[in-house]
Design a protein with these regions (language model features):
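Long, histidine/aromatic-enriched segments associated with O2/redox biology
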Residues: 19-36, 45-402
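N-terminal secretory signal peptides
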Residues: 1-16
Length: 402
């Protein structure tokens, strides 16, 4: 057995041992890993889950990573096509399906053969790690359909995003053909998944831009806070009934059970914000910073009275449109901007909705008058159609191609 084979065998032996031994979640956390258990989300209540042991199936009616309770980390990548050969891309999506179901189960993407002169099939940085609730979500842009000659299959709702007021988009963060969103409670697990998927498609796709991010979700019972210190996602829909009304596309074509993802890379001018007094910060949002409650109310989830909010506050302008969306955003920090010497940090805004026009109307209203624009700059943008879920035996995007 080669060194590489011994290295990768450790993970398989460990996982097989745990399955055969039948070690429970809390017992594993205390007896083996030493890590404390944590609450998964509100719906699971007090159920203790061993750190990283929970697996989220890749197969299902809908893709995971959309209405899935948020994980702590994201690795988000947008790809450009290097080929327009439909058969090559079908095979790539089949390969990605095979890899994905293994990755979310915490397995290697492929076992190595006996030739020690070849590179390992899996890059190996997650050997010994658990799945950490990894989800992988795939989508394609309108340009993907055009390049593959599938323009006739483009849904009427799938229109290009218009130019929004005050945005300053940079070409390197705008557009692209394919999106892969990897979310997990361990940053390395998320990165490893994307790394191996791209490695498999290296002759068919190339990376346009990527972004790692994090969410301050704590024990998953509190709304995460953004880098301005305010709760982000309070107004999100949370029930299956609401998901059907807001998130999942009303479609009988290849977008059935899918959703449209709008993404914005937003720089947050932290130094400017940090020089702003508390009252002005709260006026910008229309909520109290500590509790997250809307002005005039006591609790975070109390109904918003628009008449009590400043006319240019973020919450008021978003609520005026009265079109709910599902926000699934992550903060990011990319070191220091060499031009300004300030933090290169902000928000990877991600929203899912059944109709992209929901996002367009909200962003149009915000872009014109939102006081928040004094503290943020939108530099990246994209709109992607995220397929419905994958059936066992099927593959990602099968309904589009067939």
């Amino acid at each position: 057995m080669t060194k590489d084979e011994k290295f990768f065998e450790k993970k398989m032996d460990r996982r097989e041992f745990l399955k055969k031994a039948g070690i429970g979640g809390a017992g594993l956390a205390l007896g083996l890993s030493g890590a404390s258990a944590f609450f998964a989300n509100k719906e699971q209540g007090s159920k203790n889950i061993a750190d990283g042991q929970e697996e989220i199936s890749f197969y299902g009616k809908h893709q995971a990573g959309i209405t899935t309770p948020m994980q702590k980390n994201i690795y988000f990548v947008v790809l450009d096509l290097r080929t327009t050969d439909k058969n090559e891309l079908i095979q790539l999506f089949k390969d990605w399906t095979d890899y994905s179901q293994k990755l979310v189960n915490g397995e290697l993407v492929k076992k190595d053969g006996s030739n020690a002169l070849l590179p390992p099939s899996d890059t190996g940085e997650t050997v010994g790690l658990n799945p950490y609730r990894l989800t992988l979500t795939f989508g394609v842009s309108a340009s993907f359909l055009t390049k593959l000659g599938l323009e006739k299959k483009r849904p009427k709702l799938f229109r290009d995003l218009p130019a929004f007021p005050k945005e300053q988009l940079r070409e390197q963060y705008t557009g692209g053909d394919i999106v892969i969103q990897a979310c997990a409670d361990d940053e390395q697990v998320a990165f490893h998944a994307v790394r191996n998927l791209i490695r498999k498609g290296r002759n068919k796709v190339t990376m346009k831009w990527s972004q790692s991010g994090f969410a301050a979700i704590g024990d998953r019972t509190e709304t995460p806070r953004n880098l301005f210190g305010f709760k982000d996602g309070t107004a999100n829909v949370t029930t299956e009934k609401d998901f059907n009304k807001v998130v999942w596309a009303d479609s009988q074509d290849w977008m059935k059970n899918g959703s449209y993802m709008a993404v914005r890379r937003i720089i947050m001018h932290l130094e400017t914000w940090d020089r702003t007094n508390l009252q002005e910060q709260e006026n910008t949002f229309g909520r109290y910073k500590e509790s997250g409650a809307p002005f005039g109310k006591k609790n975070e989830f109390d109904e918003v009275d628009l008449s009590l909010l400043p006319v240019d506050s973020h919450v008021r302008l978003a609520k005026e449109v009265d079109l709910p969306i599902l926000r699934r955003s992550y903060s990011y920090s990319d070191g220091i901007d060499p031009k300004t010497g300030q933090f290169d940090a902000g928000l990877l805004f991600i929203a899912f909705q059944k109709d992209p026009d929901r996002f367009v109307k909200i962003q149009t209203n915000l872009g014109a008058d939102d006081k928040m624009n004094e503290y943020v700059t939108h530099i990246g943008s994209g709109l992607f159609a995220c397929f419905g879920g994958v059936k066992e035996g099927g593959y990602i995007g099968q309904e589009l191609f067939e």
